[in-house]
Amino acid sequence: MKKLVTLISTALLSSTMSIAAQAQDTIAIVLSTLNNPFFVSMKDGAEAKAKDLGYNLIVLDSQNDPSKELSNVEDLTVRGVKAILINPTDSDAVSNAIRMANRAKVPVITLDRGANHGEVVSHIASDNVAGGEMAGDFIADRVGENAKVIQLEGIAGTSAARERGEGFMKAVEKRHLNLLASQPADFDRTKGLNVMENLLAANPDVQAVFAQNDEMALGAVRAVQAAGKKVMIVGFDGTDDGMKAVLRGQLAATIAQQPDVIGALGVDIADKILNGGTVNKNIPVPLKVISN
């Protein structure tokens, strides 16, 4: 009987140590959606870096739903992850999820989109304001000042949409562009197509379009082609599909981000935090214009 108790105790101790080790080595990335190639690239970059550094990485998809995002973070705190990388569905709505992680003493790193509330150790993103301005300057350089333009906006409430729009409006004012319309299409290709169809009907003299991501830009391409018009379209992100569209001449340009680098940096920063290092509050990732 004593031997049996010893064996059970040893097994329980071994199990406890295994769970503790697993928790110690586990971090997570929560993405707003995996139905977008940009965030798939971000996931791939995080997974590659986690493998290099020896971490078990949990990947969760919030499906563009703040309630799903909150549920994901709650699940991760219960599972005992040591750090959470989060790409918010919405900069305000994510605050509840971040505060939940804060209460559980789990460090949070935001990727691409910021959070308006809650304690975030570090934010990693492109300079979206600069990128929006780069897009406007590109249009002015190619089409000319006073060009008639339309903007397709991303998801309202996200820092990326707000900041890209802010940068684009700087160029609109600086370069005297004539903004005919600016309407959300939620970073979605199908919505980009539908919104662009309506805007083309209302603004047949449009000369250029700035879409706040490549998915909306590609939707706009289809709408313009179907209408038999020639309109210059500039996207944002530098996704594989976006870059191919530039090479084919369907997009005039894309403001290229490096989502894989953003994901990898997130894991790097988590590693530094968990090893007692200090990190910068904001970490910018360079942008560049890719054009034909």
What are these regions (language model features)?
Residues K3-L4, A21-N292:
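A residue-level marker of the well-folded mature domains of exported/periplasmic proteins
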